[in-house]
Amino acid sequence: MVTGLSPLLFRKLSNPDIFAPTGKVKLQRQLSQDDCKLRRGSLASSLSGKQLLPLSSSVHSSVGQVTWQSTGEASNLVRMRNQSLGQSAPSLTAGLKELSLPRRGSFCRTSNRKSLIVTSSTSPTLPRPHSPLHGHTGNSPLDSPRNFSPNAPAHFSFVPARRTDGRRWSLASLPSSGYGTNTPSSTVSSSCSSQEKLHQLPFQPTADELHFLTKHFSTENVPDEEGRRSPRMRPRSRSLSPGRSPVSFDSEIIMMNHVYKERFPKATAQMEERPSLTFISSNTPDSVLPLADGALSFIHHQVIEMARDCLDKSRSGLITSHYFYELQENLEKLLQDAHERSESSDVAFVIQLVKKLMIIIARPARLLECLEFDPEEFYHLLEAAEGHAKEGHGIKCDIPRYIVSQLGLTRDPLEEMAQLSSYDSPDTPETDDSVEGRGVSQPSQKTPSEEDFETIKLISNGAYGAVFLVRHKSTRQRFAMKKINKQNLILRNQIQQAFVERDILTFAENPFVVSMFCSFETKRHLCMVMEYVEGGDCATLLKNIGALPVDMVRLYFAETVLALEYLHNYGIVHRDLKPDNLLITSMGHIKLTDFGLSKIGLMSLTTNLYEGHIEKDAREFLDKQVCGTPEYIAPEVILRQGYGKPVDWWAMGIILYEFLVGCVPFFGDTPEELFGQVISDEIVWPEGDDALPPDAQDLTSKLLHQNPLERLGTSSAYEVKQHPFFMGLDWTGLLRQKAEFIPQLESEDDTSYFDTRSERYHHVDSEDEEEVSEDGCLEIRQFSSCSPRFSKVYSSMERLSLLEERRTPPPTKRSLSEEKEDHSDGLAGLKGRDRSWVIGSPEILRKRLSVSESSHTESDSSPPMTVRHRCSGLPDGPHCPEETSSTPRKQQQEGIWVLIPPSGEGSSRPVPERPLERQLKLDEEPPGQSSRCCPALETRGRGTPQLAEEATAKAISDLAVRRARHRLLSGDSIEKRTTRPVNKVIKSASATALSLLIPSEHHACSPLASPMSPHSQSSNPSSRDSSPSRDFLPALGSLRPPIIIHRAGKKYGFTLRAIRVYMGDTDVYTVHHMVWHVEDGGPASEAGLRQGDLITHVNGEPVHGLVHTEVVELVLKSGNKVSISTTPLENTSIKVGPARKGSYKAKMARRSKRSKGKDGQESRKRSSLFRKITKQASLLHTSRSLSSLNRSLSSGESGPGSPTHSHSLSPRSPPQGYRVAPDAVHSVGGNSSQSSSPSSSVPSSPAGSGHTRPSSLHGLAPKLQRQYRSPRRKSAGSIPLSPLAHTPSPPATAASPQRSPSPLSGHGSQSFPTKLHLSPPLGRQLSRPKSAEPPRSPLLKRVQSAEKLAAALAAAEKKLAPSRKHSLDLPHGELKKELTPREASPLEVVGTRSVLSGKGPLPGKGVLQPAPSRALGTLRQDRAERRESLQKQEAIREVDSSEDDTDEEPENSQATQEPRLSPHPEASHNLLPKGSGEGTEEDTFLHRDLKKQGPVLSGLVTGATLGSPRVDVPGLSPRKVSRPQAFEEATNPLQVPSLSRSGPTSPTPSEGCWKAQHLHTQALTALCPSFSELTPTGCSAATSTSGKPGTWSWKFLIEGPDRASTNKTITRKGEPANSQDTNTTVPNLLKNLSPEEEKPQPPSVPGLTHPLLEVPSQNWPWESECEQMEKEEPSLSITEVPDSSGDRRQDIPCRAHPLSPETRPSLLWKSQELGGQQDHQDLALTSDELLKQT
């Protein structure tokens, strides 16, 4: 060993004990574990200096040698010391002179005395003792520096108290100036000022110490190369200023503090007495009234927290100049935030507060900096800088200047003072720019009050209050208003907590955190007005679909991590994280809300990343409160040990587990039992097929570590972000990622995604309640505040009105002036061509166009500089640290709507686009117009045709705009499309923020746009994802104004080509057309057509699905001028890949042409979420990865369930004209609710009934779930997933590309009952009573008594009326178009009558109302009523049919057209008694794997017939009645079952059906021109002859029987249909049918369309009932279902589809047309009627 070495040498090494055997063992073990984790790139910061050991004198090197050898060959320490550590950072070799300049922050410069450079390289003298600590034996208090407690937890106690060297340290050696001015060679240099290296790692760290060291000294700035958890130390400091080292916490710091205190007692007193006695005590938030401005109040909290922390550190001897630097930096940042986020007079108070604190710390900071100055290090750095510069490594400026900047001397303090003072002066650019705006806003900036808002409805209830959807009366924006009962707060002594929530919400500026607009008090309530996030919360999503797909979990969790990181950086501990508080925006992203239990602690300081502080931080709050939601409470809270930020990471672990598994890991019948599990139990992990991915399980288990200090995330969110689970995730582009679940809203007031929780909480708003006495709670009066976001609303309104008066004579128009271009510093000049489009009213722009962009990049650094920049009048103030806050604010106040195309890199320089040709104009809504409908798009300006007819008002709804805006985020650089029309883009004030382009194409309706009202202040655009693929369905309507090409001579100057676009992994493809070549200088080139763009429309006619010749024909028909709408291919979800090997097997999904038709559905509401789900049920494919959908169901082909297809044109949904393949319309599992959860049979659209939350959300306890948490995971049944939500399982090759497989096949853990609700996507009838829980088995259903059914029916009828409203009404024309392709295939509306019947087209209407089956008596009455309505309808139909011919998409009025559905007699017979899987739930979704499922609906009628995703009401017996009838009809070739019958049909029509079909082909054709395409060619010949179901391929489903079916009796345009659809064989379902069913089944009738997936099909004992029905009403079995108006005339053909006793209205019935022209065209037409009509 080295024992012979003199103590002196050891002194150099700092701690001789290291060679003791125990130390060696410890180090070996610890280092072997952590060796790989050490950061290679950070010099002194990874084992700061210890292993760098640049001993240059011979003595040093010999010592080093001995040391290294002495530890033994195997020692890891030796290996670490020997390895060259400076790979990424400059490498420090053994010679000091080669010390190259480390990257900023990577070298411990602060008290650099801590490195092991024990003596100067040139000095022959031996080093002096390192510090007084060396001589300290720990025996005499006098010997030890004040406050030195090596074992105190507050710092690393790595240096043992015992030192071998007994010399005392004399302060006499300290240079009096505090600056070490001696040269390195000077023997006089003081050991403290020149050679002392303040932070070196202990030489004998314990395992825990090393663990913490490696685990916690990490920064978010340096990404971990290997993506692992990053325990390696990373450079933390973000500045090159002197003396700022990342890891200054060693006993050496204490020594330095000791020296400092001994030397400068007055400065010490100033630090420790003055702040504690005066500053903190007099300014603490508890001692002063809360500031009225929430943001300032938050900043006030932070300033006091910083003062407290500074005091604690000073008393503990842990302050360093680096700490002061960071403190100052944070104070400056808070000041900046104060200026940016508040216009309140209280800003002066905060400025004063900050100045006081800065003055307090100024002198100590400077003195410490002097003490810590290390001339030797300075010279080393100088040499390194010279070498670095010589090597051309980027130091371009002259070296002296570089050195000066390294020293932090470049800042001119006078200049900074001037800037500070200028904040208050009237002549700042900010005030100058916004003087006018402020003048305008001052008068209007009245204090908000309850009278300013009108309450629309209750969103949800909570323990303390309720949240309401409200609309601001003047701006018409929607907000969520949280009303908290003051009396409750006072009684619980939680008033302060309400202020904390207000402050956090007001201050937070992050795209993943809900923002607040204003707060005020009423007599009984404190009200907070926040942005309304439409998509509900994750808890509801979990209840409805069970465990989420891993990709979806990754996105949601990552976004929550960013939100949490942001909060923690600002010292906010949420304390109540749970899925209920994670809201889903209209774009499918996450926003964190509910800060009612949050605490505000200290902002993150990198200097606090040391063990002691991390421990302290983890125990930051010692209030002993156990608060939060029991399942998510961390062990340390339960044990009342003190807690801090780690509690949020624990909750994140629970949330992650819940997302992945579907239930929480710990549960109990009582909180005590639950807590016992949390503290002691092991986590149970799913096994087998349900096993979680290893990385997900690993992340969850690390987050759920019992010890908060070892919990992942405790040191920083960075280590969570580096976990392999997020490998490959782009943290800065999360908002640009496609969300898998996109809420589909039927109107701007749709709150169906929220659970009102009325049964759990009821807050009575009794007006007679006594006013709360406010004596003793004066602070409540300070609650009213108005955030800059909200005040901007008023100012921009004023500005808009001024501009309006100035510019637009017509009172109804407001033009968005661009006059302020010059003002936009950070906004590139408005040079992008703006596509003018008219949108509802000025506020829309304000809201819509505001881009709250998040610079996620910032989220990586300690408190993210305001992460969201809003421009253009969004009520959110611009918070752009990078830019003077003035610009954005100025613009917002002035109401300037600046849309600027960001340049590719996001810089704000103007883009070289043509000057604006048009003005962006807002059309004001006529007073009477429902705010929901935005005026139709008009493109004003030369050369742009009016899109008004094409895009209905809704089309342009703000959502479309928002989406468009976001889509841009996806980074198409402007250069890529400069020549392409681009809307002016709103650019965030900060150049670094994400830039959004709004290509004009987006303005037209975006198929996916959900029906948000233009006025809705829906979730900030920041939450919108700009994923190009989602919004641009390949086939989606052109969102930018069409390009008009004027033919020159005989040429247009471009070539187009048809391309195959395959649906996911299937062999089914659709034909799209792209611009293959554009001649330079030709007419097309001049018009702006670009090569490689996808053509969506020609002359307003969608070309998706048309063959090449048809498109050419369209072009040529247009004469000398052709209008072509295109979208860049990269904006679609079409992916380019190698040619398919089996292309010869591929089948083309074609769609019938349909005219754009009117969108007429403006007044239609989409049904509630669950109904939506029904539409999308099929989309809920649980398969975990979406990868299989290579095309990721572009909206154009999005599954029927996809919003694109929902035909209920919600105000927002694009006009049908833009809608993509109608086929998509049928969402097979209309009910995407397929609940993945075991109790999936929940009614899929509980929401339908009166907006209550998806029914069954709370009611049924899924099997998976323990009772304790039962309310959470209910059947997944009601929430529609976005088309992308579940990737279809690859095996389902036949799966129709249009629908993503239902989740059924998905997670094993929650078997999805096969009863997928197949409701027509359109039919939202699922308004089944929430309580109704489908019987678990077909048997039960059978057994259920008629009485129960009758009762259920009555209830259902009540509910139906409202649900009816929501039914999606598709104009028949449209339906026809959409349905035609599929219509051919019988809709297999399981359990619902498929609306295939002629009326079926009412799909738009087809709200499958799972009316509980009715008793026969009821049925009879219904029939009578139906007959009456039939007669009326026939009359209407005649009118409508003529309309249909002209208008294929007439707004639903074409009920008469419905017959076109009937063309599928096969469909009707397909209704197969099997009940079409009805037995199970007619709502069953088609399985992804068709083969397993059995026949799939061939060419499902576009959802028209899909029965409402009918959720069986527990009391309902299977629909016994109508089925036999329908079946018989189907079997009887002569009898054309009423066309309207939309019962599920087996994929292959029976012979009878075929005959019937042929009989009516002509009539149908006349009625529905597209009928020919629909003809049920899909029935395979074989099936027709054999009684067994023929094979139906998904293709058939997708394309409609005409294409898919082998027979293709009538393919569109006479094209032969592919017989290949037989790929998927439909299992014989007959065996599933009850004997009665089998009997009626004609030989040709294929098995049920839907094989019951995993649920045995129910055999319905409906024969007798059906027979009765037939007897009563042989020709039409239609059940009337009350429509929204209460009229029960919903015609549902009984026979074709088996109706369960609860007759379900067929999808066909259309809700009354907008115009009300069509009252009830829902009746299914019998063949006779069809003939009459024709």
Curated annotation (Swiss-Prot):
Residues 1042-1130 form the PDZ domain. The keyword Magnesium applies. Appears to link the dystrophin/utrophin network with microtubule filaments via the syntrophins. Phosphorylation of DMD or UTRN may modulate their affinities for associated proteins. Functions in a multi-protein complex in spermatid maturation. Regulates lipopolysaccharide-induced IL-12 synthesis in macrophages by forming a complex with TRAF6, resulting in the inhibition of TRAF6 NF-kappa-B activation. Residues 727-795 form the AGC-kinase C-terminal domain. It is a peripheral membrane protein. The modification Phosphothreonine is found at T1446. Residues 453-726 form the Protein kinase domain. Belongs to the protein kinase superfamily. AGC Ser/Thr protein kinase family. It holds the Pfam family Pkinase. It comes from Mus musculus (Mouse). Signal peptide: none annotated. The keyword Chaperone does not apply. Residues 112-197, 216-246, 421-451, 802-834, 849-895, 919-947, 1005-1032, 1133-1484, 1501-1553, 1606-1734 are annotated as: Disordered. It is an enzyme of class 2 (transferase). GO terms for molecular function: ATP binding; magnesium ion binding; microtubule binding; protein serine kinase activity; protein serine/threonine kinase activity. One of its GO terms (biological process) is regulation of interleukin-12 production. This is Microtubule-associated serine/threonine-protein kinase 2. The modification Omega-N-methylarginine is found at R942. Its main location: membrane. CDD domains: PDZ_MAST2, STKc_MAST. ATP binds at I459, S460, N461, G462, A463, Y464, G465, A466, V467, K482. The active site is at D576 (proton acceptor).
